[in-house]
Amino acid sequence: MTMITDSLAVVLQRRDWENPGVTQLNRLAAHPPFASWRNSEEARTDRPSQQLRSLNGEWRFAWFPAPEAVPESWLECDLPEADTVVVPSNWQMHGYDAPIYTNVTYPITVNPPFVPTENPTSCYSLTFNVDESWLQEGQTRIIFDGVNSAFHLWCNGRWVGYGQDSRLPSEFDLSAFLRAGKNRLAVMVLRWSDGSYLEDQDMWRMSGIFRDVSLLHKPTTQISDFHVATRFNDDFSRAVLEAEVQMCGELRDYLRVTVSLWQGETQVASGTAPFGGEIIDERGGYADRVTLRLNVENPKLWSAEIPNLYRAVVELHTADGTLIEAEACDVGFREVRIENGLLLLNGKPLLIRGVNRHEHHPLHGQVMDEQTMVQDILLMKQNNFNAVRCSHYPNHPLWYTLCDRYGLYVVDEANIETHGMVPMNRLTDDPRWLPAMSERVTRMVQRDRNHPSVIIWSLGNESGHGANHDALYRWIKSVDPSRPVQYEGGGADTTATDIICPMYARVDEDQPFPAVPKWSIKKWLSLPGETRPLILCEYAHAMGNSLGGFAKYWQAFRQYPRLQGGFVWDWVDQSLIKYDENGNPWSAYGGDFGDTPNDRQFCMNGLVFADRTPHPALTEAKHQQQFFQFRLSGQTIEVTSEYLFRHSDNELLHWMVALDGKPLASGEVPLDVAPQGKQLIELPELPQPESAGQLWLTVRVVQPNATAWSEAGHISAWQQWRLAENLSVTLPAASHAIPHLTTSEMDFCIELGNKRWQFNRQSGFLSQMWIGDKKQLLTPLRDQFTRAPLDNDIGVSEATRIDPNAWVERWKAAGHYQAEAALLQCTADTLADAVLITTAHAWQHQGKTLFISRKTYRIDGSGQMAITVDVEVASDTPHPARIGLNCQLAQVAERVNWLGLGPQENYPDRLTAACFDRWDLPLSDMYTPYVFPSENGLRCGTRELNYGPHQWRGDFQFNISRYSQQQLMETSHRHLLHAEEGTWLNIDGFHMGIGGDDSWSPSVSAEFQLSAGRYHYQLVWCQK
């Protein structure tokens, strides 16, 4: 133990938090989570240990602007101004200091290893009692599972130690400091330390004791570490559980270790041995270690599909069987290896359906509770994810246990990111920073290596490629050859990675950046001498209304075996709850706390909102990642299973044939598909209706029984095929009524019964409609070529940093948002049975014509208005966001009914999960409440729309809500939106894709851009 004076003044003078060579003082060695059971049955059943005591709860708390402001008296007693906070928590979530959101830029002046003198510091204290039996014998430890960013610890006024690395435990021996009766802990936490330079992750920068604190009592002679691994024969019919156990304390000949393996109540294998390991070199072996090997016949293998778990109990006892203590862990028999360019699990090539996950809670910041962790896992499993990357740091210890038990593959990532350094590898190539990096990697491995869910180690994120990475790669490969190592920095394919793991590489498009090119994922595989698998560590940036083009990735993954999937960025929006002056909650992002620097809404990239409500994009991910694929040939459906290990045993295939959403025939077939197998399903003779309409066959895979992660009736996969469309000439109902045209200087007015249409001759637009004496429009029906910018449209543009290549800047520069309509033509003609209005407009900005729109409106005796639109786009203007019409309807109806793709929001490059049917939803559900308002709620492939008294027919896309595109464009947060009068309707003949390969460069694929130059569409507007 390092002995240092207890004085606060000495600690402050020494400034351990500005010395990269000091990462800890008196911290105990890393190991898997311990409980020190004194009963092996309790260890086997994972019951709460009497030797493990939580210190979570209310602590005394005082905040200071700098460590030098902390009074020395605090070491002995609480300060008069001390408040109370709950531990674990981030102090910023309790109103002390401000959270800072920044992506790349360091929130402090970059001068490593030094940090600002204004370094917010919080002083925590807790008074507690210790069992007298703990004081009489053994060792009492205190465990801090996570403290950000560095801290000093005192007990009863005496200095205990120092720790940093906010995402791994710091554990100290308190035995020499405790006394009978009351004891007092004092913890001084600093916001910034030299460790902050290694923690430049894209997340909120928060501080405090934000993970659990506990006391653990272990015997004097104790298990100090244990490591389990599984080995197999070629066909996995026989396995060996290898358990290496290490002890500390007084080594005696009578000490024994027993390792027993359990499957539920059944003991599968057991072995006992004294300490004394195998001969290592000419000086002998480890006297304090022993390795036991247990043979297991026909083990039930672990995978994310079937997470079979055993329980290993490690007992330290005397030769006569007297138990000293027991530790235990779950064991999954599984093998991970790379062979022939493929990442294999239990001999089968994996397809990673992955997502990156930050630890984030909208109310609690970076404090994770079991309920939230389980909620995340259930949602991931329900949406066909099988893998998660701990971005970008080791997670709460419970997370790994839950992933073991529910079944998720985990990339465990070291808490290292130096994204804001120039160059990025300035620290990671510096040997002075090797000790700090080494602790972050080695301690992660030592804590988490017993978890079967951890299949890949990661050296960190966005830190360039330095010599320190190479050294740590070699250390991991030496200590744990059972797992691959990945690392993206320095180009994604350096010597420090077993897997090509790029971020945001595109399917077919090269991004030839200097020094670190991002080749298309297809090209990367074919580079000379490259034999590694490719798994995208980040892709499909799900910021706001995004995930366009996701299907292209999955087509490539299924086409090329060495493209083994990737991890979507990312799981959850990192918005935080604030309250307005009336106490109403609202969602905040970067800058909303007065934090500078900040990266605005870039913290919200999730497939789910911060409260875990899904984004519409999550359904697209679920569909593309589904484990059943379908092919229709004639009346035969071929069902292919992409499960590697699971035989379908809880699936029914429901099929239905519908004409324009009206069911004509349906059936149900049990699925009986072997892993990677096929099943052919013969359908009966399908109906061939004579009436006009679209005929669709829909199949859905339903789980009739509940599972550990889903309720009964869960739909896991689906597919649709359009069978036919019977055409017919729609004749208007026989009517002797003829619309009457009245012409005035200002207007053309058409009347038919109780309906009237008014066209303004000065503007050329349909300016009003009446049904009886009720006006139907609040604004004219006008052309629309713009949208409220998406995050993907904005890219990195902001007021102080304009990116001229961003879509929104191109549209602004070209005048799309400012364009005015110049009337070229507005005429009216009376036909034999209808009135025809013909208009033409030139949409201009600063004298330049951007679009020419020609329209005809044919109003017939049935009251239908058939609208035909032809648009020409100037060849030298940017491709528009949309080509459509919009108006503000006077009505506010409760529900929206449509025949088309749904039910969720969908866009041209994100619609494979949508199904053609007749849908009916509340008006409020047609709006997607993205925290940063933008274009939203589109439904594509629409043949009919019904709202209030109105009906529209054709082939179009629409969105409908209480918010105008203008308001969405001008409003910074969703809670600031106000419902406008009436309802805004946007009907598009064509709409540009939304993109999503990344969110900082134009990423809409060419086939989803509006580049044709000429466009034609039609629709019919009538009243029901």
Curated annotation (Swiss-Prot):
Cofactor note: Binds 2 magnesium ions per monomer. Binds 1 sodium ion per monomer.
Positions bound to Mg(2+) 1: 417, 419, 462
Gene Ontology cellular-component annotations: beta-galactosidase complex
Site (Transition state stabilizer) residue list: 358, 392
Keyword Cytoplasm: no
Binding site for substrate: 103, 202, 462, 538-541, 605, 1000
PROSITE patterns (UniProt xref): GLYCOSYL_HYDROL_F2_1, GLYCOSYL_HYDROL_F2_2
Reactions performed catalytically: Hydrolysis of terminal non-reducing beta-D-galactose residues in beta-D-galactosides
Assigned EC number: 3.2.1.23
InterPro entries in alphabetical order: B-gal_small/dom_5, Bact_Beta-galactosidase, Beta-gal/glucu_dom_sf, Gal_mutarotase_sf_dom, Galactose-bd-like_sf, GH-type_carb-bd, Glyco_hydro_2, Glyco_hydro_2_AS
Residues the record lists as binding Mg(2+) 2: 598
Active site positions: 462 (proton donor), 538 (nucleophile)
Coiled coil feature spans: none
Any one GO MF annotation of this record: magnesium ion binding
BP GO terms, sorted: lactose catabolic process
Assembly description: Homotetramer.
HAMAP family attached to this UniProt entry: Beta_gal
Protein name: Beta-galactosidase
Lineage of source species: Bacteria, Pseudomonadati, Pseudomonadota, Gammaproteobacteria, Enterobacterales
